[in-house]
Amino acid sequence: MWFRTANLALVLIAALAAGPALSAELSPDAINSSEPSKKSVSKDKATPAGVRLQVLLDRAHFSPGEIDGKFGENARKALRAYAEAQQLPSADRPTQVVWKALRADEQPVNSDYAITEKDVAGPFLEKLPSKMEEMKDIPKLGYTSPREALAEKFHMSEQLLAALNPGKNFDRAGEAIVVVDTGGAERGEAAKADRIEVDKTRQTVKLFDKSNALIVFYPATIGSEEKLSPSGTLKVTEVSRSPTYRYNPDYHFKGVRSDKPFTIKPGPQ
């Protein structure tokens, strides 16, 4: 028993020690002065250069997914798409030529934000059910905390938000915090899309303008083993910003026991 207690104590000490260290490393100054390179980004660890790279890609309308400071697969996909759009050599890492194009946006990639009454008003869920059948009885698939809502609002992971704001109270209106700035002073609206390319194999969505130039990129989860997405040329006939999910029992999703159709309310906006 003593060994288990001692091991647990060591784990807790290590976790507490890692928190301040990570926060110090991911300071606004460190992030804004960082230079992404093969050595300064990591798929396993959040780094200042990883944060800056992800934010600049997001500003350019080439989404790396959730901004967490890590150079994971979604960030890699976004970087490749950005290089393609800029007619630069394909890049799996932030090469000098690609970074030169991205860093033309010289605005800081973070900004100060004061938490509002609306941010903390809720209502918040105690816990989001893991099973689909349990979700159908919830009036709205909301967030579980102000911290989760704030992270989503600024395209960030909760872990990165916490690392940038050690000791801050995310439940208190008026609290000043640091967030990543995916808007940026120079960001404008993307050109109007004329064509959408959904790649089921690469799990990506690309938007092209009338001149066939790539203007927007998103990583995406497309279809599943139970419900394959259609192939071919389709036409967008309707856009729903708050869609209701409708479960069809004919697909027999894993983990879903219901033999009757049901709906799941829209999530937060």
Regions inferred by a protein language model and the residue ranges of each:
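Bacterial N-terminal signal peptides that target proteins for export
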Residues: 1-9
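N-terminal post-signal-peptidase region of extra-cytosolic proteins
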Residues: 64, 147, 158-166, 179-194, ...
